[in-house]
Each structure stands twice: as structure tokens, then as C-alpha cells.
Amino acid sequence: MSQAGSSPLYAAIDLGSNSFHMLVVRHIDGSVQTMAKIKRKVRLAAGLDEHNSLSMEAMQRGWDCLSLFAERLQDIPKQNIRIVGTATLRTATNVDVFLEKANQILGQPIEVITGEEEAATIYKGVAHTSGGSGRRLVVDIGGASTELIIGEGFEAKALTSLKMGCVTWLENFFKDRQLNARNFDAAIEGAKQTLMPILGQYTDLGWDVCVGASGTVQALQEIMLAQGMDEVITHSKLKRLQKQAMLADHLEELDIEGLTLERALVFPSGLSILIAIFEQLEIDAMTLAGGALREGLVYEMVDELRQNDIRARTIRSVQNRYQLDCQYGEQVAKLAGKLLEQVGGEAWVAEPQGKVLLKTTAKLHEIGLTIDFKKGGEHSAYLLQHLDLPGYTRAQKFFIGEIARRYREQLTSLPEQHALSGTSGKRVLRLLRLAVLLSHRRNPDLEPCVTLTAEGDKLTLSIDAKWLEANPLTAAELEIESNRQTDIGWPLSIVTC
């Protein structure tokens, strides 16, 4: 059991068709901190015969894995543990044999949830860990089933679990382990036929953004980043990766830059399913979700974590954990937002996410000072890029970190990033630096009255002459900042009024 007075631990176990996963988290400061992630390839679905009877060998692989999990569960209160079985355990005709021994090993009941329950829990995990607004389509490709959900906010509007997965498609269409056009075409067509019954409903509902919440999508993102692409998945990138896969004659010879050995076996089958989903639903782009089934189980257990604004919860959690000055962070964020509106808002920083990322960085930019002042920006960058920040993508975390790295003093160009366009990223940095400089007295009542105007990349800051005369340090800092931005090719003029 966890020690009295310590933050409570929670565990979520997913007995999947390809892998068994255990997630252990700690509830702290209004958020969750991951303490352990344990994963074992069990390939349970591969143990189903033509009569859907689970082989003793597959069961034993599962029991061996659960024996490892059981050790960790001893330290967690029983009421803080959820264990669920999914597609293969739903299908197996002899599931009771497996469950009887599994329950004994774990000392906890295992829930075999329906496909609809699985889809609903996946959506909760996505909704509580992924930012953005509007209606979203969620795709989760498992070992023996694929869940597709359309929802808005925390409400799912359509839930579907289809009987196709990366393990079953491997056995059905790549049984000979040949990576040729015939097998890929058959796998893609088979997935398209499986999708047919839901096309009308999902097309009618529509969606604004699409997110993927599975190992297949995780593998794709790892490959794309390793190959120098951005993290957004598109149909053209999927077809490019299919061509790379087909350069290998056999599955055992598959060698794609960024693809790990453990994911290689089911990668072609998962890729085929995803290509079919993109083509049938005419998806433009997909990003990786922050969480899925296991995260959904955790959020079902912790009532305090259920709130509408995921990013606001994340910011508050980080501020509390690192004892940041919340009032000052809000002051900088408001001033940065005001400056953005003065220069034209989305006419100057085109992407709507630009304002969100500007205000987020404003509220968290001082986090590095909790380590050391001298290299505060460097420490801020490291922390913000490596902390778990539900609601923000990997690209957004990288961008926030790079902006925070440069929030004061020496100014250098931003590295390549994929959260915003290069122009918008540069402009967000300029606004943050000005907001930090103008609010350095940490009291909004002492801020100067300023007007910022823009002609393309040329900025002009108008400021009250009497205020500057009364605040010579700020006047000197503004002159230095004007030179720094101008020297790097970002013209900034300071004029008095």
C-alpha cells in the first residue's frame, strides 16, 4: 500500500490483443505524473484458432506477463486499480479459462469490456490529454479491433468498434510474410470493406480535426521524425512509407529508418488499415493523441481531473508543482495578448494556435528559474520540452521550450519547428520578449501605456515619453532590445508620444 500522506497511486492495465500494458500514475497538483509504463508483447490474438478458441500457449504468454504486473500492483490500493480486457478476450470462446487464472495472479477482477465501452474510454483518454477545440475524429488501431469515435469536448457522438486490427490483418493478409503489392492491396481493400457500414454516419457527422491513438500511429510519428518530416500524418506520407516497406521482400527483412524492431512485425498490417481509413473517410491530416484507453481508465477513477479546459489544467498543475508566480505569468500573458491584438491578431500571426502558445509560454517562461537564474532560459526550455503537458503536442512542446529559452537577454534565431510557420514562430518570440521586458516590475498597475504597430516584420513601439523618463532602466532595456531584434533582421523602432 502507498504510504500515508503521500500522493495516491493509480494503475490502469489494458490486456490488448497485441500487447499487455500497465500504466502507473501519481495524482499530484491537479494532474497526473507517470510513474511507470510497462509493456509486453503477448500477441494474444495470434493464439485464436478458426473456432475462436485461445491456445494454451497464448494464454501462458498472458499469464507470464500478468505475473510481472502483479508485483507492482501490491503497492497500490485496490480501489485505485482498473484492469480491462479488449477485443481478443471478447472474442475467445474459452475466455473463462484465461480469466480464472489471471484473476488469481492479479488478485483483482478483470473487466472484459464491450467494443463500445472500449471506444468510449479511449475517447475519454483523448479528450483529457489532447488540446484543441471543435469536433474530433479519433482512430485507435489495436491488435484485433479498431475503434473510431467522433466527439466534441468530452462528449462522444458516435462510437464504433470494428473487427480488424494489426495482428488479425497480419494473419489474414500477410501470412506468407511477403511485402508485395498484392498483399498490401488485399489488406487495404479488406479494411475498406470493413469500414463500409459506418461511412454514411461518420461523413454526415463530420469533424474538424483527426487524431490517432494507437501504437501504429505512434510508430508512424517516430518514423517521420527520424526521417526529418513533421509530425502531421497525411495520405501521401502513408503511401511513401508503404513504398519503403515494399523495398523489403519479406517482413523479416523490413528496415525503415525510425521503425523499431518490436513494432516491425505488425507495422505493414497497421499501415494498411490506416491507409484504408484515410481513403474511405477522406482524411486530410492526423496527429498523435496524448492518451487513449489506459489514460481514459485513470481519468474515470480520479474525479478531480475532470474539467473542460485541458490546457488550463496543465498550466495550473505546472505552476503549482514548480511554485511559479501565477499572477505575474497572467500579467505577461495579458500584455502579450494585447500586443498581438494591436498588431492585427491572426492577420499578423496567422495560425490560431499562435495566440495559445504565446500565452502558455508567457505563463510558464520562468520555470527554469527554479533551477538557476544564470541559465534560466536553458532550464526553462529543457523542462517545458520534457515535462508531460497534456493538451500540447510534441511539436508544440518543442516550440514553447525554444521560445522560453529566448525570453530575455541574448537573441538568436529559432531552430526549425513544426508547431507554427517560421514567420509566425518568430513573431510570437518577439511579442513574448517585449511583454516580459515591459512587465518586469511585476505589477500591472506600473506597466506603461504602449501601442505596437506592424508593417510586415517591421515593428514600431510607441511609449509615453514621461514614463520612459521616470523609468530609465526600462528605457535602456528597450533600446538594447531594439538593437537586438534589428540586428537579427527583425526591425524594431521605439518612439515616444
Swiss-Prot record:
* Record key words, sorted: Hydrolase
UniProt pathway annotation:
Purine metabolism; ppGpp biosynthesis; ppGpp from GTP: step 2/2
Organism superkingdom: Bacteria
| Molecular function terms from GO | guanosine-5'-triphosphate,3'-diphosphate diphosphatase activity
Reactions catalysed: guanosine 3'-diphosphate 5'-triphosphate + H2O = guanosine 3',5'-bis(diphosphate) + phosphate + H(+)
BP GO annotations = guanosine pentaphosphate catabolic process; guanosine tetraphosphate biosynthetic process; nucleobase-containing small molecule interconversion
Its EC top class is hydrolase
**Similarity annotation:** Belongs to the GppA/Ppx family. GppA subfamily.
HAMAP family for this protein: GppA (MF_01550)
Q: What PANTHER family does the annotation carry?
A: EXOPOLYPHOSPHATASE, RETROGRADE REGULATION PROTEIN 2
Instruction: Identify this protein by name.
Output: Guanosine-5'-triphosphate,3'-diphosphate pyrophosphatase
Q: Which organism is it from?
A: Vibrio campbellii (strain ATCC BAA-1116)
Lineage runs:
Bacteria, Pseudomonadati, Pseudomonadota, Gammaproteobacteria, Vibrionales
Question: Gene encoding it?
Answer: gppA
